[in-house]
């Protein structure tokens, strides 16, 4: 399992003193000096505050809990025995290696056993894990593991396709390159036909 308990609120800072907002602003001023800028010039006076506020929003996933989102499920599926598929869930994240953006879409399917969840909660689970420092591989596994733990479905399929700005803006600088990762559990792991059907639906034009 890939630390879906990381879906509980900020386990690293539990019991630790979190830096004050002013300390974050000071760190950003230091960064501006390091790149050769003058943090006291007019255009940059409010930049440390703005960046600190932006980071608070961009990484809000550390303060959100999978349990709070998936803790309430519906246990009456009324005889429905086909997959539930939510595709084209847009997200943004940041790579944990360079803190540079990742932009992409998630496609998720699960085959209910006795539990279903509101469709909006599927999208919220993507946000919980994407709004953190991530690797795409870990994020894919975390989403699948979270759904496995709380829904206990017959099968789960997760496909994420994303563009990594660390490949576009630096390093190899390959614009438009897309990374695809998948995670299959249960019936989707065992049944090649189910996998193929999922992939066909994902690739089908909306």
Swiss-Prot record:
It holds the Pfam family GTP_cyclohydroI. Gene3D superfamilies: 1.10.286.10, 3.30.1130.10. Transmembrane segments: none annotated. Its EC number is 3.5.4.16. One of its GO terms (cellular component) is cytoplasm. GO terms for biological process: one-carbon metabolic process; tetrahydrobiopterin biosynthetic process; tetrahydrofolate biosynthetic process. It comes from the Bacteria. It catalyses: GTP + H2O = 7,8-dihydroneopterin 3'-triphosphate + formate + H(+). Pathway: Cofactor biosynthesis; 7,8-dihydroneopterin triphosphate biosynthesis; 7,8-dihydroneopterin triphosphate from GTP: step 1/1. Keywords: GTP-binding, Hydrolase, Metal-binding, Nucleotide-binding, One-carbon metabolism, Zinc. Disulfide bonds: none annotated. Zn(2+) binds at residues 95, 98, 166. PROSITE patterns: GTP_CYCLOHYDROL_1_1. GO terms for molecular function: GTP binding; GTP cyclohydrolase I activity; zinc ion binding. Toroid-shaped homodecamer, composed of two pentamers of five dimers. Belongs to the GTP cyclohydrolase I family. This is GTP cyclohydrolase 1. It comes from Bartonella quintana (strain Toulouse) (Rochalimaea quintana).
